[in-house]
Regions:
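Pocket-forming structural segment of enzyme catalytic cores
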Residues: 17-19, 24-25, 32-113, 117, ...
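Flexible gly/pro-rich beta->alpha loop and the following alpha-helix that scaffold active-site loops
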Residues: 1-26, 38, 133, 137-140
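Short, charged, low-complexity patches
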Residues: 128-132
Length: 144
C-alpha cells in the first residue's frame, strides 16, 4: 500500500498478537510492519520503486532453500527498513540489494519472515513460487 506501518490498520496488532504462535510472512508493507513492530526504523526511498526487477542477494534462511545466492525479484515500494545501525535483538537480515538495502528479515526464534520484494509477482518468476512453497513447508512443519 501507499502508506506506512503506522497506517496499516490492524497489521501491527496482528503481528504482536500472533508472532509467537503462528508463522508469518509479511510482503512489502507487511515486511515494513514487521520491522516496525520489532523496533526497526522505516525510511522513505529516494526514488519510488514501481515494477522494477532487482538483483536480491539471499542469505541463509529456510525461506530460500533450493535457490541460488542471487535472484531477480520484483519491487514496488516507497518505504524501506533502514539498514544504518541495524542491530536488532529479535530480527536478522536474510536478503539485501547489492548496496546493502534490506530486502528480507527473519525472526531469530519464531517462523516470522518479511520480504520487501514481491515473490508473488510474475516479474519474480519461478524463484518466487519456490519462496512461497518454502514458506508453506515451514507452516506445515516440513522444514525448520
Amino acid at each position: 500500500g501507499p502508506m506506512g506501518p503506522e497506517e496499516a490498520g490492524i497489521s501491527n496488532e496482528i503481528i504482536n498478537r500472533y508472532y509467537k504462535s503462528k508463522p508469518i510472512l509479511g510482503i512489502c508493507l507487511g515486511h515494513q510492519c514487521l520491522g516496525s513492530v520489532f523496533g526497526c526504523v522505516i525510511g522513505q526511498c529516494q526514488n519510488v520503486i514501481h515494477g522494477e526487477r532487482s538483483v536480491i542477494k539471499l542469505g541463509d534462511s529456510p525461506l530460500f532453500n533450493g535457490l541460488d545466492n542471487e535472484i531477480l525479484a520484483a519491487r514496488y515500494h516507497s518505504l524501506y527498513i533502514k539498514e544504518a545501525n541495524f542491530n536488532n535483538s529479535e530480527l536478522r537480515v536474510i536478503a539485501t540489494l547489492k548496496d546493502g538495502t534490506i530486502m528480507g528479515i527473519q525472526h531469530k526464534i519464531f517462523p516470522v519472515f518479511g520480504l520487501q520484494f514481491h515473490p508473488e509477482s510474475i516479474l519474480t518468476n519461478e524463484n518466487g513460487k519456490k519462496i512461497l512453497g518454502n514458506f508453506l513447508k515451514i507452516v506445515y512443519g516440513e522444514v525448520t
